[in-house]
Regions:
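Substrate-binding cleft of secreted/luminal carbohydrate-active enzymes
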Residues: 310-318, 364-416
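Polysaccharide-binding and catalytic clefts of secreted carbohydrate-active enzymes
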Residues: 127-268, 278, 283-286, 291-298
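Catalytic domains of carbohydrate-active enzymes, especially glycoside hydrolases
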Residues: 17-40, 154-159, 299-308, 387-390
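Active-site clefts of carbohydrate-active enzymes
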Residues: 229-247, 280-283, 326-333, 353-376
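The substrate-binding groove and active-site-proximal loops of carbohydrate-active enzymes
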Residues: 4-12, 65-83, 128-142, 247-257, ...
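Glycine-rich, aromatic-flanked loop segments that form ligand/cofactor-binding clefts
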Residues: 31-56, 82-126, 159-169, 205
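Active-site-adjacent "subsite" loops/lids of carbohydrate-active enzymes
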Residues: 4-6, 101-154
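Short, acidic/polar
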Residues: 10-24, 139-150, 289-301, 374-384
Length: 416
């Protein structure tokens, strides 16, 4: 079972032992960050530092001239990843016998929101989410599509994994975060993710919903939740709060917006990439979910991309809808796919295209014990994932993990 470990360039650059250490755990591939959000990261084995602070979202390579004269453009990294940090790390990892794929974080950029506040998601209360670019806005979409193509197709890379290629919402580990005081539940979080920027207001209008009335309904529906009432779970909970018709209108707008962006980004990457370049999306099989693992329709996304990376830190249940879509190989459009959508808890099916029987379904496990991971159970977790249809493993994160964690991973992979 092929396994790939996530890595940052700063884990490798300046440490002549790093690439060999990663190769020794038994992975065949690394997923190396080329565009990444702000973070504070541990480097437990690096000879020159122990903590890296990436102060803002940045590309970890030198950009080309496609960004000349454009208001929205990627930011260069500071001293945490100077110059072509990606290229330097990729060369070392390749020399160690590892296949390098890019790791590209897209619609998640707090500096972009701070410097261009009009690009951000605006909730029903008028609060902006600077970490969450609104993916409906034309200029933002153009920026994200071009960033996907440039950051994905780096010299020496054999494929890419596109993260945050969809809506972002309230859920976000912000600096000294204090947003957990009231449990909003799945439905409440959806309402708090609804955007009311001018573009989205027009989008709701095109669905027959007045944006001002919708915002008022959202605020009224959330008022009992702020006072402690449960919001309900799943899409039924959203419909209970908003009403079935308004809820459906918001979802139609948002699903189509995300779907067309994903199609455009994958098309742009394919246009820039050599033959055989693999394109995966970090994805959640519930289309109204938001965050780093974009909500998708499984059948649709597997007809667009070469596969998905599925979060399994909380269990492996999210694999089944994607495996079900692969099981529908050869069935195009809505024929035979609606049942898969029902399993996923999503509405609609792929329109055109076919799901490939060779689609990658990568189960993503956290293997850093200090971050809630369980490297000691990786062998059994991988077996469970394989039984549910996973074809590959993703391991988060080789640079952050302790020596003991890496040894547990090595032992598990040796037995697969």
């Amino acid at each position: 079972m092929k396994a790939s470990a996530f890595v940052y360039p700063w884990d490798v650059n300046g440490d002549p032992q790093a690439a060999g250490t990663i190769a020794a755990i038994g992975v065949q591939q690394v997923t190396l960050a080329s565009a990444y959000h702000s973070t504070r990261a541990l480097t437990p084995r690096h000879p020159r530092h122990r903590i890296v602070t990436a102060e803002h979202a940045a590309v970890l390579y030198a950009t080309d001239d496609r960004w000349q004269g454009r208001e929205l453009r990627p930011y260069a990294a500071g001293d945490w990843a100077p110059g072509d940090a990606f290229g330097e790390a990729a060369a070392a990892l390749t020399d160690a016998g590892l296949e390098v794929h890019t790791w590209v974080v897209l619609a998640h950029n707090s500096r972009l929101g701070a410097e261009h506040p009009d690009t951000s998601v605006v909730n029903a209360y008028g609060d902006r989410y600077p970490w969450a670019p609104c993916i409906a806005q034309p200029a933002t979409r153009a920026y994200l599509v071009d960033l996907a193509a440039e950051a994905a197709v780096r010299p020496g890379a054999h494929g890419t994994e596109l993260e945050s290629l969809g809506w972002y919402g309230l859920q976000h580990l912000h600096a000294h975060d204090k947003t957990g005081g009231v449990g909003l539940g799945d439905a409440g979080l959806y309402l708090m993710a609804l955007c009311f920027c001018p573009t989205c207001r027009e989008g709701y209008g095109a669905q027959g919903v007045d944006a001002d009335e919708l915002a008022a309904v959202v605020r009224a529906a959330l008022e009992p939740v702020w006072r402690g009432a449960p919001s309900g779970g799943g899409w039924a909970g959203v419909e209970k709060l908003l009403g079935a018709s308004p809820a459906g209108a918001t979802r139609a707008w948002r699903d189509d917006t995300a779907r067309t962006l994903q199609e455009a980004a994958v098309t742009a990457v394919r246009g820039a990439a050599p033959a055989g370049f693999q394109i995966l999306l970090h994805a959640d099989p519930v289309s109204y979910h938001v965050g780093a693992n974009a909500g998708v329709d499984p059948a649709h996304i597997l007809s667009v991309a070469d596969g998905v990376v599925v979060p399994c830190a909380g269990g492996t249940d999210l694999l089944a809808p994607f495996a079900g879509a692969v099981g529908a190989v050869g069935v195009a459009g809505a024929v035979g796919v609606a049942g898969v959508a029902g399993v996923a808890g999503v509405a609609g099916a792929a329109e055109g295209g076919e799901v490939s029987g060779g689609s990658v379904i990568a189960a993503n496990f956290t293997v850093v014990s200090g971050m809630g991971g369980s490297p000691g159970t990786l062998a059994s977790d991988a077996a469970r994932a394989r039984a549910l249809g996973a074809t590959e493993l993703r391991l988060y994160h080789a640079g952050l993990a302790s020596d003991a964690d890496l040894e547990a991973v090595r032992s598990a992979l040796a037995g697969l």
